[in-house]
Amino acid sequence: MTAREGRAPLVRRVAVYGAVGLAAIAGVAIWSGAASHRGADTARLSADAAARDGASAASPPPALPASAGLPAPLAGSSAPRLPLDAGGHLAKSRAVRDFFDYCLSARSDLSATALDALVVRGIAAQLDGTIAQPEALDVWHRYRAYLDALAKLPDAGAVDKSDLGALQLALDQRVSIAYRTLGDWSQPFFGAEQWRQRYDLARLKIAQDRTLTEAQKAERLAALAQQMPADERAARQKADRQQAAIDQIAQLQKSGATPDAMRAQLTQTLGPDAAARVAQMQQDDASWQSRYADYAAQRAQIDAAGLSPQDRDAQIASLRQRMFTKPGEAVRAASLDRGAAAAR
């Protein structure tokens, strides 16, 4: 694999860093499937959610640490914290769903039984012997029932995005299934998401209404926007600013801007602190590419040495550990190696 093949575009990594809220407000996102689980990114999102929703709650025990015993999709990561309320019960928070979604990101590598065991271990690692432990297990079984019910829908609930009637039906079905399976957990798990989906669908209906003039559409869209809660409006405005910054970073990269030039330009839109972090990410990215290129060259020499598969793999693993010493780097390199091997 070349260094270029091992490259994760900086703009994509900045998007994860700077736009935590984008995935949650990106439009009518439910139509593409039952659940989209995002591995390490989900872990970062859930850490933010846990910090937000548990700010006034009792501090939960430390999360399950990264472990070599984790499934490959979770290697090098840590489970999000399960939040507790002041009485020690499981807090009704979106952060609980984030914990389960973190575990579900490994389900392609696990049987249903193994996935259940992973969740049980993760819950026990944080809540063993507490009143919140059986509560978390109960919510997990409810969430699994929700996902199983979605999977039984025709085409797993996927619909034609151009059919507004089908979109409305799909949303209604999901709301009904969530309430039936999750009960009073449906609101913390999906309430904000469902509100955004209804709002986006209402916008689509106005935009596609051929009986309205452009002026009437603008008036109705403005009236609809006034119904948006203040925190949601602020989140959308923030997302718009973040997307503009991400687009700017992509353009600067495309034009071949130097780190200093990029930092100077981004300071005007993001402020000096954020611009400095982006510049540092760019430097880190360049360092990674250089080290990965050196590693790939040495790995190729090992591949060409005619060793037994066991000796070859052992030498490559040792090389990774020597060259990638920061947390997660060796895992990232191994993942790229597997991708290169699969592509050959």
From Swiss-Prot:
InterPro entries hit by this protein: Lipase_chaperone
Record bears the keyword Ion transport: no
Disulfide bonds: none
TM ranges: 14-34
Lipid bilayer topology: Single-pass membrane protein
A Pfam family reported for this protein in Swiss-Prot or TrEMBL: Lipase_chap
Protein's cellular compartments: Cell inner membrane
Keyword list, A-Z: Cell inner membrane, Cell membrane, Chaperone, Lipid degradation, Lipid metabolism, Membrane, Transmembrane, Transmembrane helix
GO terms under cellular component: plasma membrane
GO biological process terms held by the UniProt record: lipid catabolic process; protein folding
Molecular function GO terms recorded: unfolded protein binding
Family: Belongs to the lipase chaperone family.
Function statement: May be involved in the folding of the extracellular lipase during its passage through the periplasm.
UniProt protein name: Lipase chaperone
Gene: lifO
